[in-house]
Structure formats: structure tokens, C-alpha cells
Regions:
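Alpha-helical transmembrane segments and their immediate juxtamembrane cytosolic regions
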Residues: 1-211
Length: 211
């Protein structure tokens, strides 16, 4: 299994970013927006799982990986959040308590800069997943644990924001696992165009039926 760059994933990520932008600028809440929201964020987590497998991350030093992920995901998150907090403080009355409240919310992933929740969510999910695959060598156990984690937020629905933050990571964990194990199928070209069409149709049906 080589570490040659999977260039086509750059195109997929570019397409995903375009879908994210469209999802945020498309005001009308109709079937198109529902469909976009059904997969444009999961797509990034699936790609993350594919890249974890492709780069043999589990065989590398986890401290260096975490440091690298922190620089690429958490540092940008902090910068965006500080900028958003600054704008918020300019537009509203500045108080130390308000500043403390805003910073605390950002640390707890109650983001001021909208979709930036994705960055710490991806960081936390990848770190936990790396720890899991380094310690759980049995693929069946890993998949089973991932499935349980993925199903928890689907069963225990909540309106509490801080629980929603945690549940986002749980759902992301499931998609990262899917990408990790889909890697071999992609490399061996076992996922044919026929199966992609089936997945595409299934995605449309499920997204519309679940809203």
C-alpha cells in the first residue's frame, strides 16, 4: 500500500467545498437544500477515513500526527473564532463577562464563525479514531464499536447544544470508519459505477424521507 497522493480526492474535496458554499447561500429550504445537507459534510469525514488508511497513519508516531492535525485544524479554528468574537464585541457592548462567555463557548465548540464547528469536530474525531485503531487490532471489533458510536445520536435525540456537539463527533466517527474501510474497495476498484448509482439513488430517497 503506497503513499502516492490520491489526486482525485483533491477534486472531490473541491466539489465538496462547492456544495458547502451552495448549501449556505441557497436560502430556500426545499428538496435540493435537504439533499445537499445530507452528504456534503459527511463527504469530508469519509475522505478523512480514506486518507488515514492511505497514509498508514496508524503505523506512525501518534504525537507527531496530533501536533500536525492541531496546526492544520485547531489553529485555523482559533483564528476564525477570535476574529468572529472581535466582530461580535465591536457590534455589541464590550464587557469582560461577555468576552469570557464568548471564549468559553468557542472552546466548547459553540462556534461564533458558523461552519467552523467542522474543524474541531474533525480534529477530535480523527484523534480518537487513531487511538482506537492503534489499540484495537481486530477490524470486526473496530467496526462494531464505530457502529455503536454512530447509532447513539440517532437513538438519543437531543436539543441540548453541547450534547449536539458531542453527537456530531459520534456521527463523524461513523463516516470516518466508512472511509477507512472503503479504501481497499476503492483501490481495488471493487466499487463500480453501478454501485455508485445505487448509493446515489439511496441517498436521495433517504434524504427526502428523513428531511
Amino acid at each position: 500500500m503506497g503513499n502516492k497522493r490520491m489526486e482525485y480526492l483533491d477534486y472531490v474535496k473541491g466539489f465538496g467545498i462547492l456544495l458547502v458554499v451552495l448549501g449556505h447561500v441557497y436560502a430556500e429550504n426545499n428538496y435540493i437544500k435537504i439533499w445537499l445537507y445530507s452528504f456534503h459534510m459527511p463527504l469530508f469525514f469519509i475522505i478523512s477515513g480514506i486518507l488515514i488508511k492511505h497514509t498508514n497513519v496508524k503505523d506512525r508516531d501518534i504525537k507527531n500526527i496530533i501536533a500536525s492535525k492541531f496546526k492544520s485544524l485547531i489553529i485555523p479554528y482559533i483564528c476564525f473564532e477570535l476574529l468572529a468574537i472581535f466582530v461580535w464585541m465591536v457590534q455589541n457592548e464590550f464587557t469582560l463577562s461577555a468576552l469570557k462567555w464568548n471564549i468559553t463557548d468557542s472552546m466548547l465548540m459553540y462556534c461564533k464563525a458558523g461552519a467552523t464547528w467542522f474543524l474541531p469536530c474533525l480534529f477530535i474525531t480523527e484523534v480518537i479514531y487513531l487511538i482506537m485503531i492503534k489499540n484495537i487490532k481486530n477490524d470486526k471489533i473496530n467496526v462494531f464499536v464505530s457502529l455503536i458510536i454512530f447509532l447513539i445520536p440517532l437513538i438519543l435525540k437531543t436539543n441540548n447544544h453541547y450534547l449536539i456537539v458531542i453527537f456530531r463527533c459520534f456521527i463523524a466517527y461513523g463516516f470516518v470508519t466508512f472511509g477507512y474501510y472503503a479504501y481497499d474497495l476503492i483501490i481495488n476498484k471493487e466499487i463500480t459505477f453501478k454501485y455508485l448509482i445505487i448509493l446515489f439513488i439511496l441517498n436521495i430517497v433517504l434524504s427526502q424521507s428523513n428531511g
